[in-house]
């Protein structure tokens, strides 16, 4: 088992991720949005923590990722960074903060990095945002790309179904992947695309390719932490594996607490001053 458990407390860097790909070591990645969860995830040995704009769904209850603001992402980013010693921390730039102009993209990227002290940022898109990616990287900020299903573009596509199933879209994705690498991205997330296409991308690129619903032949995997811990009900995509049933555990614990309070069993004599 990796991480603190095995005594490997060296800080994960973008360079180390490339080295992991080169030696065939899979990269583990999970989301976190708060200090306490980040401490646990980091201490368990995760390689990369993504402060995802999925906080819009998980933390705020929104239907999409679109409503979350830059300041809200900064708040979550700061909270996570404080809890992390080893993992590489990547923060999503939210919708509307890098699409309008290169100047605004760089300004917002610098703001996030200066305030959160994160290690890198993630942006969704290919050729459409490549000028913004170039400028941000030129400012010295590491960028992780994101292709395939892009939640920030949900209103464009209208569905969360598998992307790049037809030849035209697959070829564009492949072209965008190469373009992002050539522009200087240190890694790439592929979301919900055919496993065969993801395998080809991972094989052709020298940078790490991390998948979510993209098969097992990529260089690493990412999941939303509350999903894989079984905290959410009613969400069961094909790619999700639940490693715990915390929804049941937490519900039972809270019900027991309520019962103890109602009966006067809490606090007992040992729990008083």
Swiss-Prot record:
Binds 1 Mg(2+) ion per subunit. It catalyses: 3-methyl-2-oxobutanoate + (6R)-5,10-methylene-5,6,7,8-tetrahydrofolate + H2O = 2-dehydropantoate + (6S)-5,6,7,8-tetrahydrofolate. Keywords: Cytoplasm, Magnesium, Metal-binding, Pantothenate biosynthesis, Transferase. Pathway: Cofactor biosynthesis; (R)-pantothenate biosynthesis; (R)-pantoate from 3-methyl-2-oxobutanoate: step 1/2. Its cofactor is Mg(2+). Pfam families: Pantoate_transf. Transmembrane segments: none annotated. GO terms for cellular component: cytoplasm. Mg(2+) binds at residues 53, 92, 124. One of its GO terms (molecular function) is magnesium ion binding. The keyword Cytoplasm applies. It is an enzyme of class 2 (transferase). 3-methyl-2-oxobutanoate binds at residues 53-54, 92, 122. InterPro entries: Pantoate_hydroxy_MeTrfase, Pyrv/PenolPyrv_kinase-like_dom, Pyrv_kinase-like_dom_sf. It comes from the Bacteria. SUPFAM superfamilies: Phosphoenolpyruvate/pyruvate domain. It is found in: Cytoplasm. The active site is at residue 191. GO terms for biological process: pantothenate biosynthetic process. Homodecamer; pentamer of dimers. Belongs to the PanB family. Catalyzes the reversible reaction in which hydroxymethyl group from 5,10-methylenetetrahydrofolate is transferred onto alpha-ketoisovalerate to form ketopantoate. PANTHER family: 3-METHYL-2-OXOBUTANOATE HYDROXYMETHYLTRANSFERASE. This is 3-methyl-2-oxobutanoate hydroxymethyltransferase. It comes from Phocaeicola vulgatus (strain ATCC 8482 / DSM 1447 / JCM 5826 / CCUG 4940 / NBRC 14291 / NCTC 11154) (Bacteroides vulgatus). The lineage of its organism: Bacteria, Pseudomonadati, Bacteroidota, Bacteroidia, Bacteroidales.
């Amino acid at each position: 088992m990796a991480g603190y458990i095995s005594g490997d407390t060296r800080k994960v860097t973008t360079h180390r991720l490339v080295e992991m790909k080169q030696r065939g070591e899979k990269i583990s990645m999970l989301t976190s949005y708060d200090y306490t969860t980040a401490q646990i995830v980091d201490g368990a040995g995760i390689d990369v923590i993504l402060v995802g704009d999925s906080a819009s769904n998980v933390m705020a209850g929104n239907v999409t990722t679109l409503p979350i603001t830059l300041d809200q992402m900064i708040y979550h980013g700061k909270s996570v960074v404080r809890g992390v010693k080893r993992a590489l921390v990547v923060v999503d730039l939210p919708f509307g903060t890098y699409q309008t102009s290169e100047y605004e993209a760089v300004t917002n990227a610098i703001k996030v990095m200066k305030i959160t002290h994160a290690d890198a940022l993630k942006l969704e898109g290919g050729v459409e945002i490549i000028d913004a990616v170039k400028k941000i990287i030129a400012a010295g900020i590491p960028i992780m790309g994101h292709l395939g299903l892009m939640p920030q573009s949900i209103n464009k596509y209208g569905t969360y179904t598998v992307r790049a199933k037809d030849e035209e879209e697959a070829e564009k994705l492949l072209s965008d992947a190469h373009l992002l690498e050539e522009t200087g991205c240190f890694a790439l997330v592929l979301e919900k695309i055919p496993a065969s296409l993801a395998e080809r991308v991972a094989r052709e690129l020298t940078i790490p390719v991390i998948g979510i619903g993209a098969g097992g032949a990529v260089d690493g995997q990412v999941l939303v932490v509350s999903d894989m811990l079984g905290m959410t009900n009613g969400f069961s995509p094909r790619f999700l594996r639940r490693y715990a049933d915390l929804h049941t555990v937490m519900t039972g614990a809270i019900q027991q607490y309520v019962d103890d309070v109602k009966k006067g069993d809490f606090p007992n004599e040992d729990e008083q001053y």
